[in-house]
Amino acid sequence: MVKVCESNYPNNSKYESHFELFPFPLSDFQKYAIESIVEGQHCLVTAHTGSGKTLPAEFAIRHFVSQGKKVIYTSPIKALSNQKYYDFQQKYPDIQFGLFTGDIKTNPEADVLIMTTEILMNRLFQYNQYNQCNQYNQYNQYNQMDSSTSEMDFQINIEKELACVVFDEVHYINDAHRGQNWEKTILMLPHHVQMIMLSA
């Protein structure tokens, strides 16, 4: 079911404690997004540049990391990944961030991994291939990866650790040449992983 949230956000919501984590009043769309994240729903945020659409993603990072889970933040280009990595490190020094852009690979066991969408797509392809090759041992098929994990771009237990993937600039899915990479990535994500999609 798709719920379109265009009206004013109701007062005295049970989610007020989450909104109060920020030292400024939130926009209605930010409140709706936070509600959907807390409720375990996928979320698409469409807003103008500079309107604060990254705030729901930042909330998700804090929300899931506080639960001991991990978050992947994807962007369409290396420069944006680098910028987000720098910005988030400065803003949240208590959270560990890793960066994977093809040229740079740092902190593979971080709480939040920032990367291009293509890198996540390739990682999910490897993950699905591994699972298909080990269906006979379905209870331990991923958790007991040993030497094979060193070949991966980053090390994360997708089934047990990954809670959320943020797709920044998700409108790239309409790109004639690269859009299929977003489609494939979304289709390969396990059902338990929440998606937060940000678009101008």
Where would I find each of the regions flagged by the language model?
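Helicase-associated low-complexity/disordered flanking segments
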Residues: 1-43, 133-136
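Conserved P-loop/Walker A NTP-binding site and adjacent catalytic elements of P-loop NTPases
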Residues: 24-130, 150-200
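Long, intrinsically disordered low-complexity tandem-repeat segments
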Residues: 130-143
